């Protein structure tokens, strides 16, 4: 008679995938999940289920398990810790062997780690709080096309935050008038203007017309001010081919920077564009449209710091990162946490800032965080203090809303940022004397 190889039936995940004795390897990809199990599901089982379903596991033993080495390939839940103040919630730490992931593919990384497991019945909710990307994996990515230092050298702008402005009204202007608004802002003293994330190629303004008029505006403003100027030309499109066509046209016009919506456009498209940008000397501005769909819920989804790390690997020179100003204090530390993850080489684990793992980017270029959305001149001292020099501050309504027009609005922003930087360099406390600094600058 045939010998029985294994027992059929539903298996407890924790027998295989919960391994508290496991010592993590330097090459492992580590994940911190906030798990809210269904009533009656023990934490070990829920944590193990997450590890299993996001790596090798299925709900039962299959005979092909005998053809592979589970020990080599399985994800492991190696630690579980309760969340302070939450009864039925805990953080599950999962280690994934490096070989589970395709090199240089953020798409594959996400498909594995967050692809399937979030719809799992045994869990009420699941949130990916942080990922530790080992150098062995991050080294397979190009990363940002240029990074902070190269961007400053290209633009010849040092020692202060860069200034931008989103052209409003975002939809409905003709290409010619759009270019006119761009010119006014750049002439007034901004470094960049920006296409709104949803400006692609609509009936009232086709992309090619916009690109041509914006290039004209940039050249005119550069000639008048003697400074290098840019406009984030949004290359996001319905197909990757069309996106590349727009990026190539931008390069032919000789503009310094293009833009992409990396979440709606997708990581595959974004990585292709980032490679093109590095090969052709274009800077790449990244907008995070759709991020709140993924990161806004406290108990479910994915924290933005994970999306930020993914963007640094996929590639972008700027990415939107919230403003802090006017939000809660606690938000400030967390925002600064992922701002550091974008800019720095080495970031220590620091739970108070939401950083669950020490992250070593080795030599991958940094990304400039962009503060944008509802900010204006009076926020400038706070922004300068919070973000420091390596940032882009974007004032849409805060420039175009100036009662005298775009150029005076731009002048106001430029004067304010120069005043704040000077005051800070002279040792004044921007948090306390900020309003005074701005008032003096007004004169």
Swiss-Prot record:
KW Lipid metabolism (keyword) present: no
For this entry, the protein name equals: Ribulose bisphosphate carboxylase large chain
Q: Which UniProt keywords apply?
A: Calvin cycle, Carbon dioxide fixation, Chloroplast, Disulfide bond, Lyase, Magnesium, Metal-binding, Methylation, Monooxygenase, Oxidoreductase, Photorespiration, Photosynthesis, Plastid
**Sites where the protein binds substrate:** 116, 166, 170, 288, 320, 372
**Protein EC:** 4.1.1.39
Record note on quaternary structure: Heterohexadecamer of 8 large chains and 8 small chains; disulfide-linked. The disulfide link is formed within the large subunit homodimers.
**Listed cofactors:** Mg(2+)
Please name the source species: Abies veitchii
| Keyword Acyltransferase set for record | no
């Amino acid at each position: 008679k045939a010998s029985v190889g294994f027992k059929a039936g539903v298996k407890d995940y924790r027998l295989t995938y919960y391994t508290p004795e496991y010592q993590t390897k330097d090459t492992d990809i580590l994940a911190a999940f906030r798990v809210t199990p269904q009533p009656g599901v023990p934490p070990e089982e829920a944590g193990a289920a997450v590890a299993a379903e996001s790596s090798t596991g299925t709900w039962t033993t299959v005979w092909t398990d005998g053809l592979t080495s589970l020990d080599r390939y399985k994800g492991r839940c190696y630690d579980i810790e309760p969340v302070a103040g939450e009864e039925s919630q805990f953080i599950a730490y999962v280690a994934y062997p490096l070989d589970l992931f395709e090199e240089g593919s953020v798409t594959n990384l996400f498909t594995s780690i967050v692809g399937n497991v979030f719809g799992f019945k045994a869990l009420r909710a699941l949130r990916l709080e942080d990922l530790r990307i080992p150098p062995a994996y991050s080294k397979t990515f190009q990363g940002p096309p240029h990074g902070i230092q190269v961007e400053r050298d290209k633009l010849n702008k040092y020692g202060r935050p860069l200034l931008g402005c989103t052209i409003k009204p975002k939809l409905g202007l003709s290409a010619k008038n759009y270019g006119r608004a761009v010119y006014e802002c750049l002439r007034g003293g901004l470094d960049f203007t920006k296409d709104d994330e949803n400006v692609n190629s609509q009936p009232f303004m086709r992309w090619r017309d916009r690109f041509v008029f914006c290039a004209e505006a940039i050249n005119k403003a550069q000639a008048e001010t003697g400074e290098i100027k840019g406009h984030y030309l949004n290359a996001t499109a319905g197909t990757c081919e069309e996106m590349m066509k727009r990026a190539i046209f931008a390069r032919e016009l000789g503009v310094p920077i293009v833009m992409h919506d990396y979440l709606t456009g997708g990581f595959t498209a974004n990585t292709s564009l980032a490679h093109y940008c590095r090969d052709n000397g274009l800077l790449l501005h990244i907008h995070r449209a759709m991020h709140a769909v993924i990161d806004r819920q406290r108990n479910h989804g994915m924290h933005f710091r994970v999306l930020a790390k993914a963007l640094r690997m996929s590639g972008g020179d700027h990415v939107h990162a919230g403003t802090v100003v006017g939000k809660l204090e606690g938000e400030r530390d967390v925002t600064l946490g992922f701002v550091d993850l974008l800019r720095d080489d080495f970031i220590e684990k620091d739970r108070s800032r939401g950083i669950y793992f020490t992250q070593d980017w080795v030599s991958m270029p940094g990304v400039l965080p962009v503060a944008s959305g509802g900010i204006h001149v009076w926020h400038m001292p706070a922004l300068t203090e919070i973000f420091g020099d390596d940032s882009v501050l974007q004032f849409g309504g805060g420039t175009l809303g100036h009662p005298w027009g775009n150029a005076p609005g731009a002048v106001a922003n430029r004067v304010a940022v120069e005043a704040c930087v000077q005051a800070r360099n002279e040792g004044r406390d921007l948090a306390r004397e900020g309003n005074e600094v701005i008032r003096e600058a007004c004169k």
